[in-house]
């Protein structure tokens, strides 16, 4: 049985003054589905995210959201003042629905689920560490965990593997795939990498003001050339081959615009 969409965007257009940044964008996000939105810098990805999150209204077009939709958002990165005494555990607790909760308060209804998230993302050994001292890959797992704390129906990940090496990307993609399978949430993942995407992605959307193309990723981790360059153990990584429409799409693959 087909479930109702979590978010449906129809014919979205947006401009800042005389500059058009989104042109006739339509997309649908469902539960149990991973959609990867790719495009160069300046393609309109951040603006589209803000519209989907209801932070800004489009110049024209319509966005329909499931009633009471719970959204978890993972930002690209955060900056925490080095002088702030903030542990990983306390950082996660600040994301709870009720500020009186703690991760290990046995009286809360969410305790089991919180423990599951921490265990799933292998954060137990990091809970007492200062948040400022964790590595880039560890921080991404922490941000992902915090986005999951309110049991979202839709998880939006903004550049989740930015600044993470290929091994770290593979591990994070593995966690994201497990989250989709375990919790059944829809996932929208945003990336400026125009070729390398998560293998478990159900659909890739290529944005450059308009949707240039869409399709499925092709696995490349088993190819001899890929293994020679990166080694083995990167089964979560895949390649997306672009098939652009007849409208102008000016980005150069393999490079990002300034």
Swiss-Prot record:
Task: State the membrane topology.
Answer: Peripheral membrane protein
Question: Which parts of the sequence bind ATP?
Answer: 39-46
Q: Which reaction does it catalyse?
A: Zn(2+)(out) + ATP(in) + H2O(in) = Zn(2+)(in) + ADP(in) + phosphate(in) + H(+)(in)
Single GO term (MF): ATP binding
> Boundaries of each ABC transporter domain copy?
7-233
What Pfam families does its record include?
ABC_tran
Broad class of enzyme this protein falls into: translocase
Q: Which residues cross the membrane?
A: none
Q: Does the keyword Nucleotide-binding apply?
A: yes
The record's listing under InterPro entries reads: AAA+_ATPase, ABC_transporter-like_ATP-bd, ABC_transporter-like_CS, Metal_Ion_Import_ABC, P-loop_NTPase
Q: Where in the cell is it found?
A: Cell inner membrane
Give me any GO biological process, just one: response to zinc ion
Which PANTHER family does the entry link to? METAL TRANSPORT SYSTEM ATP-BINDING PROTEIN TM_0124-RELATED, ZINC IMPORT ATP-BINDING PROTEIN ZNUC
Subunit info here reads: The complex is composed of two ATP-binding proteins (ZnuC), two transmembrane proteins (ZnuB) and a solute-binding protein (ZnuA).
Provide the function of this protein: Part of the ABC transporter complex ZnuABC involved in zinc import. Responsible for energy coupling to the transport system.
Family the UniProt entry places it in: Belongs to the ABC transporter superfamily. Zinc importer (TC 3.A.1.15.5) family.
Q: What is this protein called?
A: Zinc import ATP-binding protein ZnuC
